[in-house]
From Swiss-Prot:
Entry comment describing in which tissues the protein is expressed: Expressed in brain and spinal cord (at protein level). In the embryonic brain cortex, expressed in neurons but not in astrocytes (at protein level).
Compartments where found: Endoplasmic reticulum membrane; Sarcoplasmic reticulum membrane; Cell membrane; Cell membrane, Sarcolemma
Originating gene: Rtn2
Top-rank lineage group of the source organism: Eukaryota
Skewed-composition ranges (Basic and acidic residues): 32-43, 135-144
Organism listed in the record: Rattus norvegicus
Entry protein name: Reticulon-2
Keyword Lipid metabolism applies: no
Biological role stated in the UniProt entry: Inhibits amyloid precursor protein processing, probably by blocking BACE1 activity. Enhances trafficking of the glutamate transporter SLC1A1/EAAC1 from the endoplasmic reticulum to the cell surface. Plays a role in the translocation of SLC2A4/GLUT4 from intracellular membranes to the cell membrane which facilitates the uptake of glucose into the cell.
GO cellular component: cell surface; endoplasmic reticulum; endoplasmic reticulum membrane; intermediate filament; neuron projection; postsynaptic density; sarcoplasmic reticulum membrane; T-tubule
Length: 469
């Protein structure tokens, strides 16, 4: 007893410091904090010092305090066994280990399973044993593995600050299963054909939100692969790039279609009317035109226009009043029967206005140019032909009225195209006979005129060339 008391007295006099006496509240459970410090390390002290100084650059005491602190924080935190570095073979679970540093690019590339040497020939990581035909696919696999490992390393940087540095025994099977599942997923994706992988580049609209969602893009084929420039592409990849090259041509065609759409629509509507595509519409328009023209034969144009406008207003007003009456007797909603036509947007965009103005201006300019060509005698022959035409019209005007000619023209427009479609072969045969007879008569006349006989064969040749063109 005499020897023990001075020892306790000495302990009482010496104050405890934070570095000599660890706090029980900071360390947590003693077994969980220090149970790994009693086992032997696999590496030597020199290697441990080099590794510690190289990775962390701090003394060993900081490493020990980090392990003690990590035991408390990581006990309740989430442990993700997939993003941790793989444990070296030959080290038991109870062995102490240094805290996992942040994985650098070199460590990530060395730890990729696909880059390690495989005992099986033709596997990944052995480019010499890979057949030349499979080298592009092998390089694509390696790049996808590197991208997946970089994502895992970025996720492990966030989880390593809160998770325990030493995995437990019951977590090891889950980590192995997760890593195997990830590898299987990656291999299944790589086993798909290349054209299916490139289809992931196109965005898809989600049915609920309508927001385009893009699949995970696969790396595009670059020039730094092992394939040469003359190596043929696979079928799926070649077709994909061919479609991509054709896209600008398609867009250019669509742009030209949009520009000519404004001018082609009226022509198509007129053609449908003249060819009687819709019998009811063509019949109604033909009847209305003929009735109006026949009325103009007996009445003035002012009275005909006023009567037609009054008839249209009577029809629309009566229909509107009828809907109001149905609303008053609670048998209708009273909406305007012409609301659909009132809601139609008749405004022209800036592009349509510019195109329309350009077309009108071009027609006006061409008409003025032709009139100047004929009446200012730019070409004597053309002016004489126009004079002959007006001379013939003087006799026609003495026999027929202008409205009569218009009526005959309307009848011809609604009958001749339909008849020509139904009897095209016979009409072409008779037209060919007539044109041949006319050309023969012209040749005889030119042969009798002095000075034009040598020009007749050249004119016939040029005419045949023009017909062929």
């Amino acid at each position: 007893m005499g020897q023990v008391l001075p020892v306790f007295a000495h302990c009482k006099e010496a104050p405890s410091t934070a570095s000599s006496t660890p706090d029980s509240t900071e360390g947590g459970n003693d077994d969980s904090d220090f149970r790994e410090l009693h086992t032997a390390r696999e590496f030597s002290e020199d290697e441990e010092e080099e590794t510690t100084s190289q990775d962390w650059g701090t003394p060993r005491e900081l490493t020990f305090s980090y392990i003690a602190f990590d035991g408390v924080v990581g006990s309740g935190g989430r442990r993700d066994s997939v993003v941790r570095r793989p444990r070296p073979q030959g080290r038991s679970v109870s062995e102490p280990r240094d805290p996992p540093p942040q994985p650098s690019l070199g460590d990530s590339l060395e730890s990729i399973p696909s880059l390690s040497q495989s005992p099986e020939p033709g596997r990944r990581g052995d480019p010499d044993t890979v057949p030349p035909a499979e080298r592009p696919l092998e390089e694509l696999r390696l790049r996808l593995d590197q991208l997946g490992w970089a994502v895992r390393s970025a996720g492990s940087g966030e989880d390593s600050a809160t998770s325990s540095s030493t995995p437990l025994e019951n977590e090891e099977p889950d980590g192995l299963e997760a890593s195997e599942a990830g590898e299987t997923n990656l291999e299944l994706r790589l086993a798909q054909p290349l054209h299916l992988q490139f289809e992931g580049l196109t965005p898809q609209l989600s049915p609920s939100s309508g927001i385009p969602q893009a699949h995970t893009p696969s790396p595009q084929r670059s020039q730094d692969l092992n394939t040469g420039p003359d190596e043929p592409l696979p079928n799926g990849e070649g077709e994909h790039w061919r479609l991509l090259e054709q896209e600008p041509i398609t867009a250019q065609c669509l742009n030209s279609t949009d520009q000519s759409e404004f001018t082609l629509e009226p022509l198509l509507l007129v053609a449908d009317l003249l060819y009687w595509k819709d019998t009811r519409t063509s019949g109604a328009i033909f009847t209305g035109l003929m009735a109006s023209l026949l009325c103009l034969l007996h009445f003035s144009i002012v009275s005909v226009a006023a009567h037609l406008a009054l008839l249209g207003l009577c029809a629309t007003i009566s229909l509107r009043v009828y809907r109001k009456v149905l609303q008053a007797v609670h048998r209708g909603d009273g909406t305007n029967p012409f609301q659909a036509y009132l809601d139609m947007d008749l405004t022209l965009t800036r592009e349509q206005t510019e195109r329309l103005s350009q077309q009108i201006a071009s027609h006006v300019v061409s008409t003025a140019t032709q009139l100047r060509h004929f009446f200012l005698v730019e070409d004597l022959v053309d002016s004489l032909k126009l004079a002959l035409l007006f001379y013939i019209l003087t006799f026609v005007g003495a026999i027929f009225n202008g409205l009569t000619l218009v009526i005959l023209g309307v009848v011809a427009l609604f009958t001749v195209p339909l008849l020509y479609r139904q009897h095209q072969a016979q009409i072409d045969q008779y037209v060919g006979l007539v044109t041949s007879q006319l050309s023969h008569i012209k040749a005889k006349i030119r042969a009798k005129i002095p000075g034009t006989g040598t020009l007749a064969p050249a004119a016939s040749v040029s005419g045949s060339k023009a017909k062929a063109e």
